[in-house]
Regions:
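N-terminal Rossmann-fold NAD(P) dinucleotide-binding loop
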Residues: 12-13
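Glycine-rich Rossmann-fold phosphate-binding loop(s) that bind the pyrophosphate
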Residues: 8-9
Length: 309
């Protein structure tokens, strides 16, 4: 089994580190456009192997895609963060070129790879990866919902005083602080609805804090988060390489599901060796469906920017 992570920044390196520690593949390639960065981080990770007890071979590469040949799974984290004064259109314009180029290079050497997209704006970059490559839709997966759902479980655990591991909670819709939809109605604590233990005000606060979770971290640390995004990407890789048939919320192509077509949005999916294998419709109520439709409209407007490039 071979996995490639494109982009050796904080998110990519963290994702690669998680993959290596869990021994999810025999060979892990970390690739970046900046000279020496991927090689250096790969060596640094390899030098923890004796301490942590893993046996994954980690190879760093400066933009040499031949080293990624034969990858079973590729995680794309490359792209620029949104800078002060940068418009949404400018960010999409820059990162669309990066993601499209990465996909082209990856498929030259790994035509059968499953691609996980973490680059932002994630819903639009996932849609671009799908439409530009022409790959079967099950082989293109956006990470956003997996991260947002983990943040949702964290917020719930803080109010309930329990372990996040004892909670089941999902976020659907877009990966953005105005487009995500935390489904607190469906959240459970060891099978019991969390709404039994939380006041209406607490529920509203948890949903609000989840939606601005990424922005809160950016304000605190001065840059985008990396531990949870990297771990979310690695968890998806694990579900694929171990054929776990595991339920995630991920950004995938919709063809009528949840009332939407020609768009990639976060919904419940089963992930296994074939990528995403099935969409599960948990049944949104009228209020949730209206929010989902609004989220789709916002993401679709971002996707429209791709037509101008």
């Amino acid at each position: 089994m071979k996995v490639t992570v494109v982009g050796a920044g904080a998110v990519g390196a963290t994702c690669a580190d998680n993959i290596a520690r869990k021994e999810l593949c025999e060979e892990l390639v970390l690739l970046d456009i900046k000279e020496g960065i991927a090689e250096g981080k790969a060596q640094d990770m390899m030098q923890t192997a004796a301490l942590l007890g893993f046996d994954t071979k980690i190879v760093g590469s400066t933009n040499d895609y031949s080293k990624t040949a034969g990858s079973d799974v590729v995680v794309i984290t490359s792209g620029l963060p949104r800078k002060p004064g940068m418009t949404r259109e400018e960010l999409i314009g820059v990162n669309a070129g990066i993601v499209k180029g990465v996909c082209e290079n990856i498929l030259k050497h790994s035509p059968n790879a499953i691609i996980i997209v973490i680059s932002n704006p994630m819903d639009t970059m996932t849609y671009l990866a799908l439409t530009s490559t022409g790959l079967p839709k099950n082989r293109i997966i956006g990470m956003g919902g997996a991260l947002d759902s983990s943040r949702f479980r964290y917020q719930l655990s803080q109010h309930l005083g329990c372990s996040p591991a004892d909670l089941n909670a999902v976020v659907v819709g877009g990966h953005g602080d105005t487009t995500m939809i935390p489904l607190i109605r469906l959240a459970t604590w060891n099978s019991a609805p969390v709404t039994k233990f939380l006041s209406e005000d607490q529920q509203k606060q948890i949903v609000a804090d989840t939606m601005v979770g990424g922005a809160t971290l950016t304000k605190l640390i001065g840059t985008s988060a990396w531990y949870a995004p990297g771990a979310a990407g690695a968890a998806m890789v694990e579900a694929i390489v171990r054929d776990e048939k595991k339920l995630f919320t991920c950004c995938v192509s919709l063809n009528g599901e949840y009332g939407q077509k020609d768009i990639c949005l976060g919904v419940h999916v089963i992930i296994g060796k074939n990528g995403w294998e099935k969409i599960l419709d948990f049944g949104l109520n009228a209020e949730e469906q209206a929010a989902f439709n609004k989220s789709a409209d916002a993401v679709r407007s971002m996707n429209d920017v791709l037509k101008t490039l």
